[in-house]
Amino acid sequence: MDGIRVYIETFGCTFNQADSEIMAGVLREEGAVLTGIDDADVIIINTCYVKHPTEHKVINRIKKIQETYPEKGLVVAGCMVEIDPSKLEAISGDASWLGPHQLRRAPQAVRAASNGLVERITGFTSDVKVKVPRVRSNPLIHIIPICEGCNGSCSYCCTRFARGRIQSYPSDLIISEAREAVASGCREIQLTAQDTAAYGVDTGEKLSDIIKGISGIPGNFRIRVGMMHPASVLRDLDGLVEAFKSEKVYSFLHLPVQSGSDSVLADMERGHTVDEFRMIVERFRSEIPDISIATDIIVGYPTEEREDFMDTCSLLEEVKPSFIHLSKYRHRPRARSSSLDEIDFRELRRRSRALEELKMRITEEENRRLVGSFQEILVVERGRKGGFIGRTGSYIPVVTETGEPGSFRRVRIRDATGTYLLAD
């Protein structure tokens, strides 16, 4: 496939970004040329399908590309391929498909698309996504998928139909890849999975051992640990708290609770209680006082009553996370909760607006506590509108006028918003 020009566009999570980097690496190794969309012979859209708004963005983007570039080959990759093939067939029946477990077959799909043929490469494999060719989107940040899939049974989720049951990758390969990334100049290692704390449930290994192993690599760099399900954290709470104490690990805990009501959590089949979430947060904060907490909330689950919603508001007021990700509940393909009646849309909108206001107040209050303080930041990239973007030791984003990507700087925080800090 020497000389085939390929453009890759990515939607969704950090894991999807890693998938795109792997596809780019595999394609370049086979002789493809990575380029912008206008110059491409083949366009790859790596889809996300976890939320209803993202589904619409993905579908509209596929349609727009087909209208704008009818002469180019199209490969649709990512979660949509496995979750909703009937809808994909309806909107893009002439496109080739590449499932998220089939990244090494990207050259096969691209060759077909470049020749006007349709190739459908789907289904699960046992392919390992570490120590494979990569093209980093940011040369300073290396994303390592440590495991793929989920053994959970959340009633609202469709992602597991795309990613399958959990497959943990060998710890020695993960640590070796991190070592090579640091040696090549990376300043940030991101560990990603659908649930990083579930790492090793199938192999007997633990996430805490991975973190400790990477922390022992010589060099000045940071480790960001991705989202962890509370039920998975409980299996190794002591080890994780200890691992997070390393100065190389961002003091940042992404712990989705989804609801502040135990009855709703039970209906969601989350496998944990509100008190267990509280206990995990309190344990981390007691031993790592500067840790920032991120959590996710689903607003308007079908069985969420007004009292349940107020319990969620109360929990956020109590815990005061630094990052709060809100999603309005909408049915997802193949999810069990799709058999339930959705709540009235006007009520859903009211609850969502109320939570959005609460979120902005809490996150701005938390960020304003840092105004006037001095923080060491890792500058990770140039800002789109000028300046530079860095991260504090607690992973809070900082916008600064001066800097050099890859450098560590001590800055004074002069102002704050609900989403970032401003430094001198």
From Swiss-Prot:
Keyword line: 4Fe-4S, Iron, Iron-sulfur, Metal-binding, S-adenosyl-L-methionine, Transferase, tRNA processing
Cofactor binding: number and manner: Binds 2 [4Fe-4S] clusters. One cluster is coordinated with 3 cysteines and an exchangeable S-adenosyl-L-methionine.
EC number: 2.8.4.5
Intrachain disulfide bonds: none
Binding site for [4Fe-4S] cluster 1: 13, 48, 79
Pfam family, one: UPF0004
UniProt-recorded Gene Ontology molecular function terms: 4 iron, 4 sulfur cluster binding; metal ion binding; N6-threonylcarbomyladenosine methylthiotransferase activity; tRNA (N(6)-L-threonylcarbamoyladenosine(37)-C(2))-methylthiotransferase
Cofactor(s) in the UniProt record: [4Fe-4S] cluster
Catalytic activity: N(6)-L-threonylcarbamoyladenosine(37) in tRNA + (sulfur carrier)-SH + AH2 + 2 S-adenosyl-L-methionine = 2-methylsulfanyl-N(6)-L-threonylcarbamoyladenosine(37) in tRNA + (sulfur carrier)-H + 5'-deoxyadenosine + L-methionine + A + S-adenosyl-L-homocysteine + 2 H(+)
The Radical SAM core domain, residue ranges: 136-365
Residues annotated as domain TRAM: 368-424
Function: Catalyzes the methylthiolation of N6-threonylcarbamoyladenosine (t(6)A), leading to the formation of 2-methylthio-N6-threonylcarbamoyladenosine (ms(2)t(6)A) at position 37 in tRNAs that read codons beginning with adenine.
NCBIfam families: MiaB-like-B (TIGR01578), MiaB/RimO family radical SAM methylthiotransferase (TIGR00089)
Protein name as annotated: Probable threonylcarbamoyladenosine tRNA methylthiotransferase
Organism: Methanothermobacter thermautotrophicus (strain ATCC 29096 / DSM 1053 / JCM 10044 / NBRC 100330 / Delta H) (Methanobacterium thermoautotrophicum)
